Amino acid sequence: MPADFALTNLTNHFLIAMPGLQDEIFSRSVVYVCEHSQRGALGLVINKPCDIDMKRLFEKVELPMCRADLSNTPVFLGGPVQTERGFVLHEATFADADKPAESVYASTMVIPGGLEMTTSKDVLEAISIGAGPRKVLVSLGYAAWGEGQLESEISENSWLTVAANNSVIFDTPVAQRYEQALLLLGLELWMLSPDAGHA
Protein backbone atom coordinates (compact mmCIF):
# COMPACT_ATOMS: atom_id res chain seq x y z
CA MET A 1 0.00 0.00 0.00
CA PRO A 2 1.48 3.40 -0.93
CA ALA A 3 2.79 5.71 1.77
CA ASP A 4 0.57 8.51 0.46
CA PHE A 5 -2.60 6.53 1.25
CA ALA A 6 -4.05 9.49 3.18
CA LEU A 7 -4.12 11.45 -0.08
CA THR A 8 -6.37 8.82 -1.66
CA ASN A 9 -8.66 8.02 1.26
CA LEU A 10 -12.18 7.78 -0.14
CA THR A 11 -14.14 7.95 3.12
CA ASN A 12 -17.12 10.31 2.62
CA HIS A 13 -16.84 9.98 -1.18
CA PHE A 14 -19.11 8.57 -3.85
CA LEU A 15 -18.09 5.72 -6.09
CA ILE A 16 -19.91 6.10 -9.41
CA ALA A 17 -20.09 2.95 -11.52
CA MET A 18 -18.70 3.28 -15.03
CA PRO A 19 -20.88 1.95 -17.87
CA GLY A 20 -18.58 -1.05 -18.33
CA LEU A 21 -19.37 -2.33 -14.82
CA GLN A 22 -22.00 -4.93 -15.61
CA ASP A 23 -23.12 -6.34 -12.28
CA GLU A 24 -26.67 -6.83 -11.04
CA ILE A 25 -26.09 -4.76 -7.92
CA PHE A 26 -23.39 -2.33 -9.01
CA SER A 27 -24.40 -1.47 -12.58
CA ARG A 28 -25.21 2.30 -12.70
CA SER A 29 -24.80 2.47 -8.94
CA VAL A 30 -23.68 5.25 -6.65
CA VAL A 31 -21.96 3.98 -3.50
CA TYR A 32 -21.41 6.18 -0.46
CA VAL A 33 -18.09 5.15 1.12
CA CYS A 34 -18.50 5.02 4.91
CA GLU A 35 -15.01 3.77 5.64
CA HIS A 36 -11.82 3.36 3.62
CA SER A 37 -8.51 2.29 5.08
CA GLN A 38 -5.51 0.19 4.17
CA ARG A 39 -7.53 -2.87 5.25
CA GLY A 40 -10.32 -2.24 2.72
CA ALA A 41 -13.52 -0.28 2.25
CA LEU A 42 -17.18 -0.35 3.27
CA GLY A 43 -20.02 1.51 1.61
CA LEU A 44 -23.75 1.68 0.91
CA VAL A 45 -25.40 1.79 -2.51
CA ILE A 46 -27.71 4.83 -2.39
CA ASN A 47 -29.68 4.43 -5.61
CA LYS A 48 -30.97 0.83 -5.74
CA PRO A 49 -34.33 0.59 -3.94
CA CYS A 50 -35.58 -2.75 -2.58
CA ASP A 51 -39.16 -3.85 -3.01
CA ILE A 52 -40.18 -2.58 0.44
CA ASP A 53 -40.68 0.90 1.81
CA MET A 54 -40.03 2.28 5.28
CA LYS A 55 -43.60 1.71 6.45
CA ARG A 56 -43.37 -2.01 5.58
CA LEU A 57 -39.93 -2.31 7.17
CA PHE A 58 -41.18 -0.79 10.41
CA GLU A 59 -44.13 -3.21 10.39
CA LYS A 60 -41.67 -6.10 10.01
CA VAL A 61 -39.66 -4.97 13.04
CA GLU A 62 -42.89 -4.27 14.96
CA LEU A 63 -42.42 -0.54 15.34
CA PRO A 64 -44.97 2.20 14.63
CA MET A 65 -44.16 4.69 11.89
CA CYS A 66 -45.05 8.20 13.05
CA ARG A 67 -43.01 9.96 10.36
CA ALA A 68 -45.41 10.50 7.46
CA ASP A 69 -42.55 12.03 5.45
CA LEU A 70 -40.71 8.68 5.55
CA SER A 71 -43.56 6.16 5.16
CA ASN A 72 -43.28 5.78 1.39
CA THR A 73 -39.51 6.24 1.27
CA PRO A 74 -37.86 3.15 -0.22
CA VAL A 75 -35.46 0.92 1.66
CA PHE A 76 -32.30 0.37 -0.38
CA LEU A 77 -30.17 -2.62 -1.28
CA GLY A 78 -26.95 -1.33 0.23
CA GLY A 79 -24.80 -4.11 -1.19
CA PRO A 80 -24.40 -7.87 -1.35
CA VAL A 81 -23.02 -8.42 2.18
CA GLN A 82 -25.37 -9.17 5.12
CA THR A 83 -28.52 -8.35 3.15
CA GLU A 84 -30.71 -9.39 6.09
CA ARG A 85 -29.20 -6.67 8.29
CA GLY A 86 -30.23 -3.01 8.38
CA PHE A 87 -27.84 -0.08 8.00
CA VAL A 88 -29.08 3.45 8.63
CA LEU A 89 -27.15 6.32 7.08
CA HIS A 90 -28.12 9.59 8.73
CA GLU A 91 -27.04 13.05 9.76
CA ALA A 92 -24.89 13.14 12.87
CA THR A 93 -26.77 13.10 16.17
CA PHE A 94 -24.60 13.79 19.20
CA ALA A 95 -25.36 12.94 22.80
CA ASP A 96 -23.13 15.76 24.02
CA ALA A 97 -22.12 18.81 22.00
CA ASP A 98 -18.77 18.78 23.82
CA LYS A 99 -18.07 15.21 22.61
CA PRO A 100 -18.85 15.21 18.87
CA ALA A 101 -17.26 11.79 18.37
CA GLU A 102 -19.93 10.07 20.49
CA SER A 103 -23.29 9.24 18.92
CA VAL A 104 -26.52 8.86 20.86
CA TYR A 105 -27.04 5.37 19.37
CA ALA A 106 -25.56 2.12 20.62
CA SER A 107 -23.79 0.97 17.46
CA THR A 108 -22.76 3.85 15.24
CA MET A 109 -19.86 4.56 12.91
CA VAL A 110 -19.09 8.29 12.90
CA ILE A 111 -18.02 9.21 9.37
CA PRO A 112 -15.71 12.19 8.90
CA GLY A 113 -17.78 14.77 7.04
CA GLY A 114 -20.90 14.84 9.19
CA LEU A 115 -22.80 11.59 8.60
CA GLU A 116 -23.17 8.46 10.69
CA MET A 117 -24.05 4.86 9.93
CA THR A 118 -25.99 3.10 12.67
CA THR A 119 -26.76 -0.61 12.87
CA SER A 120 -28.52 -0.76 16.24
CA LYS A 121 -32.32 -0.84 16.47
CA ASP A 122 -32.42 2.21 18.75
CA VAL A 123 -32.15 4.56 15.77
CA LEU A 124 -35.28 2.95 14.24
CA GLU A 125 -37.04 3.23 17.60
CA ALA A 126 -36.22 6.94 17.72
CA ILE A 127 -37.43 7.47 14.15
CA SER A 128 -40.62 5.51 14.85
CA ILE A 129 -41.76 7.99 17.50
CA GLY A 130 -40.86 11.05 15.46
CA ALA A 131 -37.50 11.67 17.12
CA GLY A 132 -34.11 10.72 15.77
CA PRO A 133 -32.36 12.05 12.70
CA ARG A 134 -34.51 13.97 10.20
CA LYS A 135 -32.67 12.79 7.09
CA VAL A 136 -32.09 9.06 6.80
CA LEU A 137 -31.35 6.40 4.22
CA VAL A 138 -32.08 2.84 5.33
CA SER A 139 -30.45 -0.03 3.49
CA LEU A 140 -30.33 -3.79 3.75
CA GLY A 141 -26.79 -5.05 3.28
CA TYR A 142 -23.60 -3.22 2.44
CA ALA A 143 -20.75 -3.30 -0.04
CA ALA A 144 -17.27 -4.32 1.06
CA TRP A 145 -13.84 -4.48 -0.52
CA GLY A 146 -10.77 -6.25 0.86
CA GLU A 147 -7.28 -4.80 1.07
CA GLY A 148 -6.34 -3.19 -2.24
CA GLN A 149 -9.49 -4.45 -3.99
CA LEU A 150 -11.21 -1.09 -4.42
CA GLU A 151 -7.99 0.57 -5.56
CA SER A 152 -7.62 -2.19 -8.16
CA GLU A 153 -11.19 -1.71 -9.41
CA ILE A 154 -10.64 2.05 -9.69
CA SER A 155 -7.42 1.53 -11.67
CA GLU A 156 -9.39 -0.78 -14.00
CA ASN A 157 -11.85 2.09 -14.64
CA SER A 158 -14.78 0.40 -12.89
CA TRP A 159 -15.46 3.47 -10.74
CA LEU A 160 -15.26 7.24 -10.80
CA THR A 161 -14.78 8.95 -7.44
CA VAL A 162 -15.95 12.31 -6.13
CA ALA A 163 -16.41 13.92 -2.71
CA ALA A 164 -19.89 13.06 -1.43
CA ASN A 165 -22.71 15.57 -1.36
CA ASN A 166 -25.43 14.96 1.25
CA SER A 167 -28.07 16.52 -0.99
CA VAL A 168 -27.59 13.71 -3.52
CA ILE A 169 -28.14 11.14 -0.75
CA PHE A 170 -31.13 12.69 1.01
CA ASP A 171 -32.79 15.24 -1.29
CA THR A 172 -32.35 13.97 -4.86
CA PRO A 173 -35.02 11.64 -6.29
CA VAL A 174 -33.67 8.08 -6.53
CA ALA A 175 -33.87 7.92 -10.33
CA GLN A 176 -31.70 11.05 -10.62
CA ARG A 177 -28.93 10.18 -8.14
CA TYR A 178 -26.60 8.58 -10.68
CA GLU A 179 -26.76 11.58 -13.03
CA GLN A 180 -26.50 14.05 -10.12
CA ALA A 181 -23.39 12.29 -8.81
CA LEU A 182 -21.84 12.53 -12.28
CA LEU A 183 -22.65 16.25 -12.38
CA LEU A 184 -20.48 16.71 -9.27
CA LEU A 185 -17.60 15.86 -11.62
CA GLY A 186 -18.98 18.05 -14.40
CA LEU A 187 -19.90 14.95 -16.41
CA GLU A 188 -23.02 13.66 -18.10
CA LEU A 189 -23.81 10.04 -18.94
CA TRP A 190 -23.30 10.50 -22.69
CA MET A 191 -19.69 11.51 -22.02
CA LEU A 192 -18.79 8.12 -20.54
CA SER A 193 -17.49 5.38 -22.78
CA PRO A 194 -18.57 1.82 -21.99
CA ASP A 195 -15.09 0.67 -23.00
CA ALA A 196 -12.60 0.98 -20.16
CA GLY A 197 -9.09 2.02 -21.03
CA HIS A 198 -6.33 4.48 -20.40
CA ALA A 199 -5.29 7.13 -22.89
From Swiss-Prot:
Gene Ontology CC: one annotated term: cytosol
Pfam families the record matches: DUF179
Family matches, as Gene3D superfamilies: VC0467-like
Record-linked SUPFAM superfamilies: VC0467-like
Domain of life assignment: Bacteria
Transmembrane residue ranges: none
InterPro entries on file: AlgH-like
UniProt xrefs under HAMAP family: UPF0301
Family, as annotated: Belongs to the UPF0301 (AlgH) family.
The name this protein goes by in its record: UPF0301 protein Rfer_1377
Native source organism of the sequence: Albidiferax ferrireducens (strain ATCC BAA-621 / DSM 15236 / T118)
Taxonomic placement: Bacteria, Pseudomonadati, Pseudomonadota, Betaproteobacteria, Burkholderiales
